[in-house]
A protein has these predicted regions:
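Conserved activation segment of eukaryotic-like protein kinases, specifically the C-terminal portion
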Residues: 190-207
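C-terminal boundary/linker segments immediately following FHA domains
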Residues: 427-461
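Catalytic-loop of the protein kinase fold
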Residues: 152, 156-174
Length: 461
């Protein structure tokens, strides 16, 4: 047996000098305090304004010279985590939708360090609230879904993954349609965790750690469906037997059956006439039936074979392409303003009849359209023409070159504004040629042609 551990004498038995020295070594606090000034690693100071979240949480709102930021404090960090965060802040955010580390901060009082990242604007809502809230305009939701696809592509290109996320980590602007993605500590692997069950891929359940893009693509597909249809993809008839809340979503995702899977009717969407609450997908039925075939095919693939075969899941680039087309096809009902989908295939099948609104059921009024190369764009007020429409070979994105708006005194008249920074040549239906300079607006008329440079667009009304 080894020698017994030495017993330290009580503080009172130590010599006066030793006792004073021992007592004068205060333990460093684990968190900074409100009002404290922190030192930023990349230069400058940040003042702690308030604590964020639950009492005791290591999250604070801080203010630098330029703006307010979110600070997450790590009192006992692993050495590698600091290097990872320094790299992330140095390289910058891979995509504007990511609430990404921008700097590190230290305290003269508290142990450890903190990481600063942007705060979502107050106009942004958590995606979780969208599922439980009132119907929201479709165009911003589709735009937010497109941004998430772009952000996922950028993350993968930078070597990161959507690890451990939940619906609470996703925010969107219900008016403009931008998306924000939090959870950088899990994306960067600083904090371990599988996230909440509603986004967890089937193969990652049971505590199994799954690396690579396939689990990301399952989470991305779930987020896309939640945004576009304002509903959880596995909440069909089975949801009626469960209490409302996050626990129900987790349970449904544990044994996922897509509510629009034609081969699995046990969890089919239930019409509102049979379930007025809409918990079983009733509000999503009309929009699903009118959605472009490309988008429906991706969801059917992701929540069909993709549930059993991870490599068979649609990639983020496929989502970006399909959602870009869906955004181009949206226009509001003239009666209730609900966004509907312009589907040329369905229009031809109806013999050119526009069909009824997915919300009010009244006959739709077809919007102005523009054919640009292979694209057919609908041009309601508020729509945009993007750079990828007019520049051959450019990837789908959100860089607008033209905006459509109503005449301020005559809302029935639409105009198209050049926001590209380049002068375009336009041709009126009578053949007259004129320049359209940046910042100028011209009336949308049937037969109007615009030479964008590489592509020509023609208006059809």
């Amino acid at each position: 047996m080894g020698a017994p551990a030495p017993v330290l004498p009580p503080l009172a038995t130590l010599g006066a000098g030793s006792a004073a020295a021992f007592a004068q070594k205060p333990v460093a606090p684990s968190l900074p305090s409100v009002g404290e000034e922190l030192t930023l690693e990349r230069g400058g100071k940040a003042t702690v304004l308030a604590q964020e979240g639950d009492p005791g949480a290591a999250a604070f709102r801080v203010k630098t010279v330029e703006r307010e930021l979110l600070l997450r404090w790590r009192a006992t960090p692993a050495p590698a985590s600091r290097e990872t965060l320094q790299r992330a802040a140095r390289e910058g955010m891979p995509h504007g939708a990511l609430l990404w580390p921008v700097d590190l901060a230290t305290s003269s009082k508290a142990a450890g360090f903190g990481c600063l990242s942007p705060l979502p604007s107050p106009s942004f809502l958590p995606l979780a609230s969208l599922l439980a809230g009132a119907p929201s305009p479709l165009r911003p939701r589709v735009t937010a879904a497109l941004h998430l696809a772009e952000a996922t592509l950028a993350l993968h290109a930078a070597g990161w993954h959507l690890r451990g996320l939940s619906l609470k980590d996703v925010f969107f602007d219900p008016s403009g349609g931008e998306a924000r993605l939090a959870g950088w500590d899990r994306i960067l692997g600083i904090v371990e965790g599988t996230g909440s069950g509603e986004l967890l891929a089937p193969e990652a359940r049971g505590g199994q750690k799954v690396e690579g893009p396939y689990a990301d693509l399952h989470a991305l597909a779930v987020l896309q469906f939640c945004l576009i249809y304002q509903h959880f993809p596995f909440a069909g008839r089975k949801a009626l037997g469960l209490p409302a809340g996050e626990a129900a979503l987790d349970q449904l995702a544990a044994s996922p059956v897509f509510l629009f899977d034609p081969a699995r009717r046990e969890n089919e969407a239930v019409p509102l006439a049979q379930d007025a609450t809409g918990r079983a997908g009733g509000r999503a039925i009309a929009l699903w039936e009118s959605t472009l075939g490309d988008v429906k095919s991706l969801f059917s693939q992701a929540f069909g074979d993709g549930l059993r075969n991870p490599p068979g899941r649609p990639g983020a680039s496929s989502w970006r392409l399909a959602l870009g087309k869906l955004r181009d096809a949206l226009y509001p009902c003239a009666h209730c303003t609900t966004d509907n989908v312009y589907d040329l295939v369905a229009l031809k099948a109806r013999g050119g009849a526009p069909g009824g609104c997915i919300h009010c059921g009244r006959e739709l009024v077809l919007p102005a359209r523009m054919k640009v190369g292979k694209h057919v764009l609908v041009l309601p007020a508020g729509s945009k023409i993007y750079r990828h429409h007019v520049e051959i070979g450019r990837s789908i994105g959100s860089d607008a070159v033209a905006e459509v708006s109503c005449h301020p005194q005559k809302p029935e008249i639409l105009g198209i504004k050049n926001v590209s920074g380049q002068t375009w040549s336009i041709q009126w239906p009578d053949g007259k040629l004129l320049p359209l300079e940046p910042g100028k607006t011209i009336k949308l008329e049937n037969g109007l042609k615009i030479q964008f440079g590489q592509q020509e667009g023609e208006v059809r009304r």
